[in-house]
């Protein structure tokens, strides 16, 4: 969607995977969906080094609303859990240099059973969100037909645009239509949405992460061309810092989401996050790669019989990112290859930085064999910058070194 927004994948925090539809604020006040939860997460994002790295969206998900609309038919937040209202919450978030995302559902009800946005309510709800000062809308698709979705998702894009407020638009439409052509028209999606959920919701497990990785890379030829500045494929939230992933698996999710040019929307408790999870999510070089201005989605380029996979993402200034991923379950695996085997141009030399360890290999030539040691369900990730390209010139003076553009 060419609305000037989401020129790099959106980054921030999203309530759903970790906090779900917990509305029991009497017995569980710190974990329930309430204004306090979002205010506390905004404080953590602003004060614990997240905002400076680019994490800026505070995303409300389902179960924020009252069970009924008001007398004028407007959506209203639950008065007990959001006593100050959404506008006050938006002001609180904006005062910390952050942005607020809200959740709606194109249909009779939201997935959690709260008031949905039927086709006759689209303009009204867009106006309400704009008046509240919302910066992003995630529009889900429970309780609506394919026909209603085909009408409603483009209708909401127009309605948001006509409010005059810049609002990033996240569409769940393709996930409800199986995620693939011909049922999903990605050309149209790129024109009406800034990002879209293609596939299943992530759960707090490695199996869930793998199923998402499998689906996205199996279908990469269909999906990859449609990602770019202003329009992104969304494989769903980062679950790093929760319960289901090991340390290695957490590093793998971060690396693979970065290769995919995926939105980095964390869903974890930032008040209690472990130092090791925080370090993964706050890796500067990783975020720089994710936020690369070209916005090219990476691909799986090798799938070995040894259960090693290699992924490549082209970056600006002729740089690239490589991920070596092990699906093995036995022990650390020594994987030997060369940049030539991975399709890099001959005669080039690269400065390589390991994204997690920070170690640098200087002057790695395309033809040189190298070995990486990859832990079970783990990754090794490299950032590569060309040093120079050796070009044989016919001019006097023999070969000259020209920078690789």
Swiss-Prot record:
Any one GO CC term of the record: lysosome
Catalytic residues as annotated in Swiss-Prot or TrEMBL: 140 (nucleophile), 201 (proton donor)
Glycan-bearing residues: 161, 185, 369
UniProt KW keywords: Disulfide bond, Glycoprotein, Glycosidase, Hydrolase, Lipid metabolism, Lysosome
Entry's EC annotation: 3.2.1.49
One BP annotation, GO: oligosaccharide metabolic process
Keyword Disulfide bond: yes
Residues holding substrate: 61-62, 138, 172, 197, 201
Quaternary structure (record): Homodimer.
Name this protein carries in UniProt: Alpha-N-acetylgalactosaminidase
Organism: Gallus gallus
Gene this protein is translated from: NAGA
């Amino acid at each position: 969607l060419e609305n000037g927004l989401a020129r790099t994948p959106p980054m921030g925090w999203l309530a759903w995977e970790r906090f779900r539809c917990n509305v029991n604020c009497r017995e569980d006040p710190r974990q329930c969906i309430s204004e306090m939860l979002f205010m506390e997460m905004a404080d953590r994002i602003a004060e614990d080094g997240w905002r400076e790295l680019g994490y800026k969206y505070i995303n409300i998900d389902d179960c924020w609303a009252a069970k009924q609309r008001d007398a004028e038919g407007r959506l209203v937040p639950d008065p007990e859990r959001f006593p100050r209202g959404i506008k006050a919450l938006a002001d609180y978030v904006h005062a910390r240099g952050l942005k607020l995302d809200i959740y709606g559902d194109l249909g009779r009800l939201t997935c959690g059973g709260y008031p949905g946005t039927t086709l006759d309510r689209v303009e009204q709800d867009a106006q309400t969100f704009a008046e509240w000062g919302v910066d992003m809308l995630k529009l889900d698709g429970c309780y609506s037909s394919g026909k209603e979705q085909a009408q409603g998702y483009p209708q909401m894009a127009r309605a948001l645009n006509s409010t005059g407020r810049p609002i990033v638009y996240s569409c769940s439409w393709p996930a409800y239509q199986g995620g693939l052509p011909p049922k999903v028209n990605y050309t149209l999606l790129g024109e009406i949405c800034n990002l879209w959920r293609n596939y299943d919701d992530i759960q707090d497990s490695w199996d869930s992460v793998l199923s998402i990785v499998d689906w996205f890379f199996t279908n990469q030829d269909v999906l990859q061309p449609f990602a770019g500045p202003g329009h992104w494929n969304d494989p769903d939230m980062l679950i790093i810092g929760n319960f289901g992933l090991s340390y290695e698996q957490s590093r793998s999710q971060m690396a693979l989401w970065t290769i995919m040019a995926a939105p980095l929307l964390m869903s974890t408790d930032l008040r209690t996050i472990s130092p090791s999870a925080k370090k993964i999510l706050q890796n500067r070089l990783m975020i720089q790669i994710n936020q690369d201005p070209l916005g090219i989605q990476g691909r799986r380029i090798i799938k070995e019989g040894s259960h090693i996979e290699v992924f490549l993402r082209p970056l600006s200034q002729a740089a690239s990112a490589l991920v070596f991923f092990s699906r093995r379950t036995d022990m650390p695996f020594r994987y030997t290859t060369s940049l030539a085997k991975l399709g890099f141009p001959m005669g080039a030399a690269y400065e390589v930085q390991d994204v997690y360890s920070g170690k640098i290999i200087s002057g790695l030539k395309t033809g040189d064999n190298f070995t990486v040691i990859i832990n079970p369900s783990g990754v090794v990730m490299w950032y590569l910058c060309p040093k120079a390209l050796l070009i044989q010139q016919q001019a006097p003076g023999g070969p000259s070194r020209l920078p690789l553009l």
